[in-house]
């Protein structure tokens, strides 16, 4: 299957994926320590760099070297947190991935089933329309086998009111007499 099957259910809320912000919120709730400590490590790194910059401007090389070492420690803490969190939550991530794949498979199957139901309904409507159309054609053919009088009445009614000649009581009596003969 190269592309998904088209359906009118494409815009349905049930088949929508989560937004990146929702995904971030869900991941933050699942693994709260990794981003929190990682953010703390980033803040400590920025603070150490800022202090090193101020020490360099002031000409205090001892404080500057100390802050550069603190920056390295903060970056190490950040990296260690990310790696440890990745190892700790690896099994949960694989389980979550398997669950998402099963969910995606189920959604795809539901979408396909809904599409097939929709096609069946359209096919049924099409068959009903064809049957109705065939019945109308059959009725029209039967109506075509009637005597010429029906054609005359149809031609008479097709005339505009301004084009019709005056048809009075005497003319109606003459028509009745001529039809009987």
Swiss-Prot record:
Subunit structure comment from the entry: Associates with the respiratory chain complex III/complex IV supercomplex.
Keyword Methyltransferase annotated: no
The name this protein goes by in its record: Respiratory supercomplex factor 1, mitochondrial
Top-level taxonomic group: Eukaryota
Regions crossing the membrane: 33-50, 70-89
Places the protein is found: Mitochondrion membrane
Any one GO cellular component localisation term in the record: mitochondrial membrane
GO BP annotations, alphabetical order: mitochondrial respirasome assembly
Family: Belongs to the RCF1 family.
Residues in HIG1 domain copies: 5-100
Main location: mitochondrion
Annotated gene: rcf1
Annotated source species: Emericella nidulans (strain FGSC A4 / ATCC 38163 / CBS 112.46 / NRRL 194 / M139) (Aspergillus nidulans)
UniProt keywords, alphabetically: Membrane, Mitochondrion, Transmembrane, Transmembrane helix
PANTHER family xrefs: HIG1 DOMAIN FAMILY MEMBER 1A, HYPOXIA-INDUCBILE GENE 1 HIG1 -RELATED
């Amino acid at each position: 299957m190269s592309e998904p099957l088209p359906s009118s259910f494409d815009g349905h809320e049930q088949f929508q994926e989560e937004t990146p912000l929702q995904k971030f919120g869900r991941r933050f709730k699942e693994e709260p320590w990794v981003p929190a400590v990682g953010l703390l490590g980033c803040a400590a790194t920025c603070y150490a760099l800022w202090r090193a910059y101020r020490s360099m401007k002031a000409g205090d090389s001892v404080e500057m070297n100390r802050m550069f070492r603190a920056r390295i420690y903060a970056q190490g803490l950040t990296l260690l947190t990310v790696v440890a969190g990745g190892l700790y939550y690896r099994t949960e991530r694989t389980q979550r991935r398997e669950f998402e794949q099963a969910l995606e498979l189920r959604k795809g199957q539901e979408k396909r089933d809904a599409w097939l139901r929709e096609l069946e309904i359209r096919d049924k409507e099409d068959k009903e329309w064809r049957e109705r159309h065939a019945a109308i054609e059959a009725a029209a053919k039967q109506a075509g086998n009637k005597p010429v009088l029906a054609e005359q009445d149809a031609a008479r009614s097709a005339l505009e009111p301004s084009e019709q000649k005056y048809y009075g009581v005497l003319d109606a009596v003459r028509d009745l007499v001529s039809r009987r003969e």
